């Protein structure tokens, strides 16, 4: 099933969080690429993901249009099978920070929350 290995994790804020993102899938990137986009506190993940599509999400912009990036704290590129990327993201304060995959259609299952206490 298409999903992140963890759909929730908790930290103490403020903090620098290291995210090691690895695509364990087998299908080609063009058909089943994945990314990790950590959104700012309070952002509606579903609305954000849908807005990415109407804002011009394409493979060239990693399915994260430039005008949508101000709503994110950090993101990876779209990864194909076996690819990995590490992010270090500042979590400034306590709150709930959603994360999603912005590859078209993936946000329904590939989502989660980072809870900062």
Give names to the regions the model predicted.
Residues 34-69:
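The feature marks short-to-medium sequence segments in extracytoplasmic or secretory-pathway proteins
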């Amino acid at each position: 099933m298409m999903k992140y290995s963890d759909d929730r994790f908790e930290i103490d804020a403020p903090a620098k969080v290291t995210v090691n993102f690895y695509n364990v899938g087998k299908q080609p990137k063009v058909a089943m690429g994945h990314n990790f986009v950590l959104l700012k506190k309070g952002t509606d993940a579903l609305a954000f993901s849908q807005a990415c599509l109407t804002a011009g999400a394409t493979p060239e912009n990693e399915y994260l249009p430039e005008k949508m990036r101000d709503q994110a704290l950090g993101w990876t590129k779209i990864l194909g099978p076996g690819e990995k990327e590490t992010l270090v993201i500042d979590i400034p304060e306590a709150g709930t920070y959603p994360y999603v995959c912005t590859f078209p259609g993936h946000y329904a299952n590939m989502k989660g929350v980072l809870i900062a206490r």
